């Protein structure tokens, strides 16, 4: 059994660690609140832009654009959003497992995959995974802007336009609530078909200068907005997962200290009992 001094030292070490995890929990909770506000702000814009593009596309069915064309799938591309830091539970690993299963299904059909990564964890994973990383960006921080993602997004859009990839997907963790974050794979290109309620829309619109020019400008903005939405969703998910992980670590540290304190008390009691026994034995001998 460890000595009382060793046990006390270990309790002190765990207590210091508990202070750190508790502070990290509070910081994550504060950051999560701000990230939730960004999610709530960006969701309506992304949803409305998708609706507008669907309506404009229906206004001119003769308009052709590479982003709207279905073609034989030989290569697929993924824009994968991850965190830059760890200590957020299984957030990244669950996301990577989901996209790995998706890639496996494509490979069984003879389709190869290429990647762009937003976040250092994704870059590291896919370099080890063996995939070709066309673009990567890390250090988006707690307040990402759409300017931060334009570079990697443009690389993947150019690859799609040039026929290097035939489908483009976005992978991120969707923020549901504090306790739940869903790994999500969304198709970006070709542009998914409009939803039924959009197709059933009966209003006619006049577009200036014309639907073609509007759609041309909106398509790139649409992809950028969807990727940015994924970034803010993932940021909120990261802080929620980190808050939960740090709370669990803080609670576990408390339980471990209680166990060690009990061991220390037993060891101290045994030492005192031994000393009393030795004193009594010495008195009897005298």
From Swiss-Prot:
GO molecular function term, any single one = proton-transporting ATP synthase activity, rotational mechanism
Sorted UniProt keywords: ATP synthesis, Cell inner membrane, Cell membrane, CF(1), Hydrogen ion transport, Ion transport, Membrane, Transport
The entry's localization annotation reads:
Cell inner membrane
Q: Spell out the Pfam families in the cross-references.
A: ATP-synt
- Where would you say this protein principally sits, based on its record? membrane
Recorded topology in the membrane? Peripheral membrane protein
List, alphabetically, the GO terms of the cellular component aspect.
Answer: plasma membrane; proton-transporting ATP synthase complex
Question: What domain of life?
Answer: Bacteria
Question: Subunit composition?
Answer: F-type ATPases have 2 components, CF(1) - the catalytic core - and CF(0) - the membrane proton channel. CF(1) has five subunits: alpha(3), beta(3), gamma(1), delta(1), epsilon(1). CF(0) has three main subunits: a, b and c.
Protein function: Produces ATP from ADP in the presence of a proton gradient across the membrane. The gamma chain is believed to be important in regulating ATPase activity and the flow of protons through the CF(0) complex.
Family annotation (NCBIfam families): ATPsyn_F1gamma, PRK05621.1-1
UniProt name for this protein: ATP synthase gamma chain
Q: Which organism is it from?
A: Pseudoalteromonas translucida (strain TAC 125)
